[in-house]
From Swiss-Prot:
Function according to Swiss-Prot or TrEMBL: Catalyzes the reversible transfer of the CoA moiety from gamma-butyrobetainyl-CoA to L-carnitine to generate L-carnitinyl-CoA and gamma-butyrobetaine. Is also able to catalyze the reversible transfer of the CoA moiety from gamma-butyrobetainyl-CoA or L-carnitinyl-CoA to crotonobetaine to generate crotonobetainyl-CoA.
Molecular function as annotated in GO: L-carnitine CoA-transferase activity
Name of the molecule in the record: L-carnitine CoA-transferase
Compartment(s) of residence: Cytoplasm
Keyword Ion transport: no
Keyword Coiled coil tagged: no
Coiled-coil regions listed in the entry: none
Similarity field: Belongs to the CoA-transferase III family. CaiB subfamily.
Catalytic activity line of the entry: crotonobetainyl-CoA + (R)-carnitine = crotonobetaine + (R)-carnitinyl-CoA; 4-(trimethylamino)butanoyl-CoA + (R)-carnitine = (R)-carnitinyl-CoA + 4-(trimethylamino)butanoate
Amino acid sequence: MNHLPMPTFGPLAGVRVVFSGIEIAGPFAGQMFAEWGAEVIWIENVAWADTIRVQPNYPQLSRRNLHALSLNIFKDEGREAFLKLMETTDIFIEASKGPAFARRGITDEVLWEHNPKLVIAHLSGFGQYGTEEYTNLPAYNTIAQAFSGYLIQNGDVDQPMPAFPYTADYFSGMTATTAALAALHKVRETGKGESIDIAMYEVMLRMGQYFMMDYFNGGEICPRMTKGKDPYYAGCGLYKCADGYIVMELVGITQINECFKDIGLAHILGTPEVPEGTQLIHRVECPYGPLVEEKLDAWLATHTIADVQARFAELNIACAKVLTIPELEGNPQYVARESITQWQTMDGRTCKGPNIMPKFKNNPGKIWRGMPSHGMDTAAILKNIGYSEADIKELVGKGLAKVED
């Protein structure tokens, strides 16, 4: 296979990934592949571009490093072109409502007829099978959170609240990335393709697993947080200092002993309620839980964030300031690791945003291109799989493909 023009870099150099999906979840998987060196082709509708393009800045991050193909993959010669593209593809990711591709005649078996080694990742809200009541429903971030039991665990005691921004989309997209890579590893061993069924609600069910296990195995429902504090453990969660907020985790024998001395609770150490060797203070089961919170709140309220961080560093208590977005760029850790970076958009503007993660030492990722315009690479991609100028012109004339104006 001849690859499209792009630099060679990253651990996935030489891998061809194609994705069909809009907004966040499916495309986030494609974004990860593209930043790790894969050749990633983004399929868009001919008549209507991906709705993410209406956003002013986010698409420049989420669609960087991609090749843009505008093709009607379900109709006539457009379908033929898509299936021909699959012959040279390692991983195909589609995000839609349930078995939408199968309903339109593009089943796993059809794809494997054209490429027996193809890894296929289906990403949907409720999965490829189940009850019709659910499998054909649309789903977004909040839908997946609500249906999975994740949303009900978040928020405050007075009201549940979804986790933002778009947590279920990103978790589901990353699940598609890792699952597809696992499948590709096996395919290269066996020569046999794989199909992956990723249901967003199941991803969030797994992400919300921690406290659920107490219910499934004992009937205990974990309460939601109170003002950002851990529902079970005192000294864990969000706290207010004299000049802003911190998060902390008061965990460990030495940490509890020394912290209690600072906040005036040394006298309860070694009691039956806080015996020697205590590593966590349960805010409900320990009678002193409310007192610990009261004393800690009072002590933190009289100290600045800098003072608290310095003291907690001495005591080896995990703690961090809650940074505002404007504070990120100037933070020395961000600067040292170049966590925020800049790149050029296709129209020559400078865009700033999160850098590639994680950081590969020997085969680092790279930003080599901004977001392509609608249909920008259609001609190049079709030529790459054997189409002539005349063939492409015919597809465009029939409304089955769009090339850049």
